[in-house]
Regions:
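Flexible "stalk/tail and boundary" regions
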Residues: 79-81, 132-140, 227-237, 253, ...
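Beta-rich, blade/repeat-based domains predominating
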Residues: 9-23, 52-69, 96-112, 147-164, ...
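Hydrophobic alpha-helical segments and helix pairs
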Residues: 84-146
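Short loop/turn segments immediately following beta-strands, especially the blade-tip
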Residues: 78-83, 137-138, 179-188, 285-290
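Conserved beta-strand positions in repeat-built beta-propeller and related beta-rich domains
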Residues: 20-21, 26-31, 67-72, 113-125, ...
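Blade-level signature of beta-propeller repeat domains, shared across WD40, Kelch, NHL, RCC1
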Residues: 252-297
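A short beta-strand motif characteristic of beta-propeller blades
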Residues: 2-8, 44-50, 88-95, 141-148, ...
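A short loop-to-beta-strand structural motif that recurs across blades of beta-propeller domains
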Residues: 35-37, 73, 129-132, 176-178, ...
Length: 297
């Protein structure tokens, strides 16, 4: 299957793609550039806005704009005509170490926002990462962690019925994807178990998406692949993209049947074998995805 380049974005770390059904547009972030991007297929128009600090993940906000996991916590971001993102502080995250930030995040099927944190020096392997839940607590109170002892939490996803939560850790020392039983009523994950040992497959587990049949799609960082695992953890197929570091994927397009893939453009390395690194790509895998849930807060 051919991966189509939709935008030669040259993102340092392109992450958190979210399809806006209302706008028929793809949004995503470039973490180190502190930018939110938008691309509309209808007219091939691209636009971006600058944030006040690194932003790592986004979910649609009910008041318009975006709920974003950033360096210091969670913010409500609203794109402005001046090319900047107006930010309203929602919640602090008291990181375990300096130089940490949010990483992967998304809403469950009921609109609760889950987000992980990591140390910015990934190579150090600090097990200081945590997983947090935000349901709109008032007053900007610091979030309390639900899970700790993580290095690079990633791969958050929820089954179509909302009763299974997925989480991965991308660090080379871990490379695991876990599944949890998840109660849609109270939003509490339990019964953590190994879903996929990614050391048995090419690439490290990065960002993910779930299709309407329950297939779990995850970007295989360093391998230039996007894997689909069936709900029982079996590898169903692997699709190639023309870059080594696909970062996250999301279903979009008019029928939610296009799998968009963001990627990473490494610094200080020869990119002659992957000149499109940091681009956004489209795959048509023959399955449909699910619309991302709006934050309920």
């Amino acid at each position: 299957m051919h991966a189509e380049l939709v935008l030669d974005a040259r993102n340092g770390t392109g992450e958190s793609p979210v399809w806006s059904v209302a706008e028929q547009a793809l949004y995503w972030v470039d973490i180190p550039a502190r930018r939110l991007h938008r691309w509309r297929p209808a007219d091939n128009a691209a636009q971006s806005w600058e944030a006040h600090e690194m932003l790592a993940c986004i979910a649609r906000h009910p008041a318009g704009g975006w709920l974003a996991g950033m360096e210091s916590g969670l913010f409500h971001l609203r794109p402005g005509d001046d090319g900047r993102l107006a930010a309203t502080h929602l919640a602090d995250i008291r990181h375990a170490l300096p130089e940490m930030r949010c990483n992967d995040g998304r809403c469950d099927r009921q609109g609760r926002f889950w987000v992980g944190s990591m140390h910015q020096e990934m190579a150090a392997g600090h097990r200081a990462g945590m997983l947090y839940r935000f349901v709109g607590e008032a007053g900007g109170a610091p979030l309390l962690p639900w899970l700790d002892d993580l290095v690079v939490p990633n791969g958050l996803g929820f089954s179509p019925d909302g009763r299974t939560m997925y989480l991965s850790d991308s660090h080379p020392s871990v490379q695991a994807i876990w599944a949890f039983d998840y109660d849609p009523d109270d939003g509490v994950p339990h019964n953590r178990r190994l879903f996929v040992d990614m050391r048995r497959h090419p690439g490290r587990p990065d960002g993910a998406a779930v299709d309407e049949d329950g297939g779990y799609w995850i970007c295989a960082n360093d391998a230039g692949l996007v894997h689909r695992f069936s709900p029982d953890g079996r590898l169903d197929r692997s699709l190639a993209v023309p870059v080594k570091k696909p970062a996250m994927c999301a279903f979009g397009g008019p029928g939610l049947d296009t799998l968009f893939v963001t990627s990473i453009r490494p610094q200080g390395v020869d990119l002659s074998d992957q000149p499109l690194a940091g681009g956004v790509f489209a795959l048509r895998p023959g399955v449909r995805g699910l619309e991302e849930t709006v934050f309920r807060g």
